[in-house]
């Protein structure tokens, strides 16, 4: 009996010692994730910031070329016409690209333009050598404007941060007409708050989703100095 008690006490001592060990540091497993897998060929994978099952997929939208651009991003193309808040990923058909936002410097236009003519619209090349693509975070410099665009997302919100060069002509263009592939806007509109820090708007469209209705609110860190409708 005495031997049994000794063994039992030793077992508890070993257990207590094990409990006293420091917890291992949590490993950052997302560092092994490559969100750009599937962005070439016929992969149709979206690149940008989102969370699982979120309503927002905020990221760059390129000048559309053909079926392989239906996610808004293709690894062979570095053009950007804006950062849209909804994208499909890995699908065989295109839609969405709702509420496209583009930071610019200089003359403002609503034309998206074509790559063959750099002055045909507001589009810019993205500096892919400095592009950062991580789970939940996206960043890229816009070569034409000297602007760095960063974004992240929650399940319902896309958050943008634009770093502009020193300029009196910095602006942010909201394009409610832009849509993915077969998507076409049927009704759009928005209103500004009295202090010019908030936009409330809507975009109705038809396409793969025949009666899609998107409502949004955008808040700025600084009041807009002026508002132009194009």
Ranges and model annotations:
Residues 23-230:
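Accessory carbohydrate-recognition regions in carbohydrate-active enzymes
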Residues 7-16:
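Bacterial N-terminal signal peptides
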């Amino acid at each position: 009996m005495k031997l049994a008690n000794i063994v039992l006490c030793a077992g508890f001592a070993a257990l207590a010692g094990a409990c006293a060990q420091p917890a291992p540091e949590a490993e950052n497993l997302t560092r092994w994730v490559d969100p750009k897998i599937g962005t070439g060929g016929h992969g149709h994978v979206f690149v940008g910031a989102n969370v699982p099952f979120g309503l927002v997929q905020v990221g760059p939208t390129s000048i559309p070329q053909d079926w392989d651009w239906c996610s808004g991003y293709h690894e062979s193309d570095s053009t950007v016409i804006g950062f849209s808040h909804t994208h499909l990923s890995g699908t065989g058909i295109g839609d969405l690209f709702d509420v496209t936002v583009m930071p610019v410097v200089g003359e403002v236009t609503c034309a998206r333009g074509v790559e063959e003519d750099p002055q045909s619209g507001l589009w810019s090349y993205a500096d892919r050598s400095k592009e950062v693509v991580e789970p939940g975070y996206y960043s890229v410099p816009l070569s034409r404007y000297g602007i760095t665009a960063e974004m992240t997302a929650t399940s319902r919100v896309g958050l943008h941060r634009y770093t502009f060069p020193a300029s009196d002509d910095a602006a942010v263009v909201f394009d409610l007409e832009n849509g993915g592939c077969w998507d076409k806007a049927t009704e759009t509109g928005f209103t500004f708050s009295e202090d010019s820090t908030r936009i409330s708007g809507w975009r109705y469209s038809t396409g793969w989703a025949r009666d899609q209705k998107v409502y949004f609110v955008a808040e700025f860190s600084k009041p807009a100095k002026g508002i132009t409708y194009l």
